[in-house]
Amino acid sequence: MVSTPQFLVFLLFWIPASRGDILLTQSPAILSVSPGERVSFSCRASQSIGTSIHWYQQRTNGSPRLLIKYASESISGIPSRFSGSGSGTDFTLSINSVESEDIADYYCQQSNSWP
């Protein structure tokens, strides 16, 4: 019997510690999927930030790579299977038809306010 290979996609949490900062909460923390599936990651802000959210991918021992800027704007050179949506406090990063090269940490970053 041949089994479908599975792999893990890990999310990294970005949680500012200073009082008054915008808190971002990502979910799920760990996700196991099969190649070809669609996956979605959520990022929730503690207060409205318009569309000032950016999504990054970081592979093991690699540098962060910007995937989506301002919630839904695509980046040149990033495969079209990556897409973003949302505004205000709720944002989503989706990957259509996941590939093995997508094994990585994914995280959101806000640019509405800085410490």
UniProtKB/Swiss-Prot annotation:
One Pfam family in the UniProt entry: V-set
User: What are the GO BP annotations of this UniProt entry?
Assistant: adaptive immune response
- Cellular compartments per GO CC: immunoglobulin complex
Q: Where is this region: Complementarity-determining-1?
A: 44-54
Give the signal sequence positions.
1-20
Which InterPro entries does its entry note?
Ig-like_dom, Ig-like_dom_sf, Ig-like_fold, Ig_sub, Ig_sub2, Ig_V-set, IgV_Light_Chain
Cysteine-cysteine disulfides: 43-108
What residue spans carry the region label Complementarity-determining-2?
70-76
Cite the residue spans of the region called Framework-2: 55-69
Chain spans, region Framework-1: 21-43
Region listing for Framework-3, in residue ranges: 77-108
What keywords does the record list, in alphabetical order?
Adaptive immunity, Disulfide bond, Immunity, Immunoglobulin, Signal
Q: Residues annotated as region Complementarity-determining-3?
A: 109-115
Lineage: superkingdom: Eukaryota
**Further comment:** There appears to be two possible splice junctions at the 3' end of the intron. The alternate would code for a protein lacking residues 17-19.
This protein is called Immunoglobulin kappa variable 5-48
- Please give the organism: Mus musculus (Mouse)
Instruction: Name the gene.
Output: Igkv5-48
